[in-house]
Structures are given as C-alpha cells and as structure tokens.
C-alpha cells in the first residue's frame, strides 16, 4: 500500500462560474474572487477579528490563486508576485446535473449524478398534499408548519414559538433537492426529530428527493439557535463509490463531519462527528495521527456553506477561510512520506450573489504531500478525476468507472 490520503472538502468554495451557469441563473458567480474583492474594498472588516485583504498564504502556496485565475480568467491578483505552487493545482467542472452536496461528493468519489433530482416548487404549500398527510399520519403529528421555501434561520424565528406551543414540526425546502424538518430539541425531542426524519426519508423516495435533513434548534423565542445535531438522511448513491471499493479492499475509510450522511453511511468504516470548522479540523488531525497505511480520511467543512454562503455573510466567510488556511501547517507536519492531501469543494455558494442558494461553479483541485512536486493539472472535466487519482495512489485493484487520474 502506498501512503494515506486525506481529503478536505471546503463545502461551497467555488472558484468561478461554469460554462453552463446560465442554466442555473448563476452567470458571474465566483465565491473566491468576490470574497477577495470585498475584502480588498474593506467590506469584510470585523472588529477585533479580521481586517483588510484576504490572507490565505498556505492555500496560495498550494496553487489556489493560480487555479482560480485559470478557472475564471479574472486577473484579480498578480500571480507574478506569488511563489511557484508546491503541489498539483487546477480546477474541475461538474458533470452532475445538480449543484448540491450529494451530487458534488458522489461525483468526487467516482459517481456523477446523471439523473434529475426531484424539487419542490417555490410556492406556498409547496409539498404534495399526499406527502404531508401521510407524513402527519405515520408520525402521529397534530400537523405541520411552514410548507414553503425558506431560510432555515429565518423560519425558526418566524415559526419556532408556534412550533413549541402546538407540537407541530416545521417543514420547508430550498432550491436544493431537500425536505427539511426543524424542531426544538427540548420541546419536541431530538430523538423524536430523528425518528420522523427516517419516516420522511421513506416517503420522499418516490419524489426523487436527495436528502431529508434534521434541523434541530434550541433556545427561547427571539433567540432561537440551530444546534450542531443536524443529521442528513441521503438516498444512497446509484453505484458503488470510491469509499465502497476501499472498504471492500480492507481499507479504513474515516468519515468526519457529515461525510457519512452524504454517502448514506455506505463504504465507511469509522464515523467521527464534530460541530464547527475548527472542531472538524481537530478531528481530522486526530484521525491522521492514527490512520493506517492505505486509508482515507475524508472531511467536509460545512460551515463555509451553511453559516456563511447561504446566509450571504461575506465577512464571516472570509474569516472562516483564514482560520482554515492557518491550520494547514498542523496537518502537513503529520504527513508520512507517501501521504497525499486533496483540497476541493462540492459546488459554489457565492455570498455576494442574489438569493441564498448554491451557485454553479468550478471547484479548486489542490493536491500536496511530502513527495509531490509542482504541477498545473489544468481543467479537469469531471470531479471524478479526484476519486480516480485517489484510487490510483492507494493502489486499488481496478480503476473507478468514471474519471481520469491526474497523477
């Protein structure tokens, strides 16, 4: 076996609108560049936290800005002032039809999503009457609240008090293929929320819905806060992913954060939960200290998307990027001679863009390790090139069905 692989997914960190962005209403989106420019204009200053230009020295040294320039062609930074990147760098184009978390992650692991997800229309009472009535019946509920497209933080402020008073869970959706259920951890019960999400998962299968998401919250009216006990109930990938093949080959597949949920807990040998980007980084470091040869450590950093991208918090996103960047040296010192680290994203979520939804963008593809030289890998025509490269490095007995290795 040849070394280990660590994959860090910066959830929603796009680096330029894709050629098909018009189909999604995302022409001009660019998560990285727009954050960079907002910082440069002084619009992302946070008293006592951050100020001025976006500072990502470690990601820059791995080729992030070179990849972003190649992706969009926008001359947002003087590349001649930067050192030659110390690893492989480029960008990837999504082949999956969606711009969502499962599509991006599954494609990255060798399974592009070539079918259309089901979506709920953006109108009041957006869910089919049959679905809601059966959900209420099977869960023994007095009813439901919401039934619309909404921001998760706004809808709990709007309906949280009524939810506590009536015992009716809040159901809502977004532009993604999701059925989301919010409930108060104490008043409704966390386990009860999980139980009704499992029922909902079975009910929405016929509608081709990608995920049912438990959105627990706590606190009192006027100060409700979502907790870290979110759970995603995903439909399983339609084919075996890289994770399945590694597990079948006797490898350790260590899923950190919501990775196990995204892959419907398939192909995973160990699940580690953590809340918040810094706790997720801590968990990644701990896993890398003990992960055996031939293993995969796979982490999703969800805060970029859920806390800053969807909420269109440009300054918060900038600060989160700088926090993430500052910790990369801690990971590098743990790498063994043949280890490789891959940094990528699953889609975009430009915090400067209208609305609150994901944006159809290219993703960065950065790869480094003790024995990795500098190489521009250019445009990758499928996220699955990442999975194929991992499969080659970990010496799987046969290649994945999709993707071209860039090793």
Swiss-Prot record:
One GO BP annotation of this record: 5-phosphoribose 1-diphosphate biosynthetic process
Enzyme superclass (EC): isomerase
GO cellular component: cytosol
Function: Isomerase that catalyzes the conversion of deoxy-ribose 1-phosphate (dRib-1-P) and ribose 1-phosphate (Rib-1-P) to deoxy-ribose 5-phosphate (dRib-5-P) and ribose 5-phosphate (Rib-5-P), respectively.
Keywords, in A-Z order: Cytoplasm, Isomerase, Manganese, Metal-binding
Gene Ontology MF terms in the entry: magnesium ion binding; manganese ion binding; phosphopentomutase activity
Enzyme Commission (EC) number: 5.4.2.7
Cofactor binding note from Swiss-Prot or TrEMBL: Binds 2 manganese ions.
Residues annotated to bind Mn(2+) 1: 11, 346-347
NCBIfam families to which the protein is assigned, alphabetical: deoB (TIGR01696), PRK05362.1 (NF003766)
Major site of localization recorded for this protein: cytoplasm
Top-level taxon in the UniProt lineage: Bacteria
Identification of the protein by name: Phosphopentomutase
Pathway(s) it belongs to: Carbohydrate degradation; 2-deoxy-D-ribose 1-phosphate degradation; D-glyceraldehyde 3-phosphate and acetaldehyde from 2-deoxy-alpha-D-ribose 1-phosphate: step 1/2
Subcellular location: Cytoplasm
Known catalytic reactions: 2-deoxy-alpha-D-ribose 1-phosphate = 2-deoxy-D-ribose 5-phosphate; alpha-D-ribose 1-phosphate = D-ribose 5-phosphate
Species name: Legionella pneumophila (strain Corby)
Family: Belongs to the phosphopentomutase family.
Requisite cofactors: Mn(2+)
Residues the entry annotates as binding Mn(2+) 2: 305, 310, 358
InterPro entries: Alkaline_phosphatase_core_sf (IPR017850), DeoB (IPR010045), Metalloenzyme (IPR006124), Phosphopentomutase_DeoB_cap_sf (IPR024052)
């Amino acid at each position: 076996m040849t070394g280990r692989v660590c994959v860090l997914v910066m959830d929603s960190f796009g680096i330029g609108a894709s050629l098909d962005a018009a189909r999604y209403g995302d022409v001009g989106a660019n998560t990285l560049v727009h954050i960079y420019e907002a910082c440069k204009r002084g619009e992302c200053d946070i008293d006592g936290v951050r100020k001025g230009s976006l500072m990502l020295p470690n990601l820059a040294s791995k080729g992030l800005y070179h990849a972003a320039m190649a992706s969009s062609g926008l001359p947002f930074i003087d590349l001649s002032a930067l050192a030659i990147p110390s690893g492989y760098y480029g960008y990837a184009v999504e082949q999956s039809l969606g711009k969502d978390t499962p599509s991006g992650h599954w494609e990255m692991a060798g399974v592009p999503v070539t079918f259309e997800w089901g979506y709920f229309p953006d109108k009041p009472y957006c869910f089919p009457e049959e679905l809601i009535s059966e959900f209420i019946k099977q869960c023994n509920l007095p009813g439901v609240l919401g039934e619309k497209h909404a921001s998760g933080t706004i809808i709990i402020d709007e309906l949280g008090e009524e939810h506590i008073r009536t015992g009716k869970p809040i159901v809502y959706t977004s532009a993604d293929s999701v059925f989301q259920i919010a409930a108060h951890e104490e008043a409704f019960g966390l386990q009860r929320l999980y139980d009704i999400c499992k029922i909902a998962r079975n009910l929405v299968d016929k509608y081709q819905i990608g995920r049912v998401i438990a959105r627990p919250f706590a606190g009192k009216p006027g100060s409700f806060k979502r907790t870290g006990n979110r759970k995603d109930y995903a439909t399983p990938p339609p084919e075996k992913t890289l994770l399945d093949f590694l597990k079948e080959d006797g490898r350790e597949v260590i899923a950190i954060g919501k990775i196990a949920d995204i892959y419907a807990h398939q192909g995973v040998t160990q699940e580690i939960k953590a809340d918040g980007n810094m706790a997720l980084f801590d968990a990644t470091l701990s896993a890398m200290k003990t992960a055996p040869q031939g293993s995969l450590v796979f982490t999703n950093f969800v805060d970029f998307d859920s806390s800053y991208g969807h909420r269109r918090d440009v300054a918060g996103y900038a600060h989160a990027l700088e926090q993430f960047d500052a910790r990369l040296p801690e990971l590098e010192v743990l790498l063994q001679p043949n280890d490789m680290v891959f940094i990528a994203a699953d889609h975009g979520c430009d915090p400067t863009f209208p609305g609150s939804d994901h944006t159809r963008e290219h993703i960065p593809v950065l790869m480094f390790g003790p024995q990795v030289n500098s190489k521009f890998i250019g445009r990758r025509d499928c996220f699955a090139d990442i999975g194929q490269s991992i499969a080659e490095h970990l010496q799987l007995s046969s290649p994945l069905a999709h993707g071209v290795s860039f090793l």
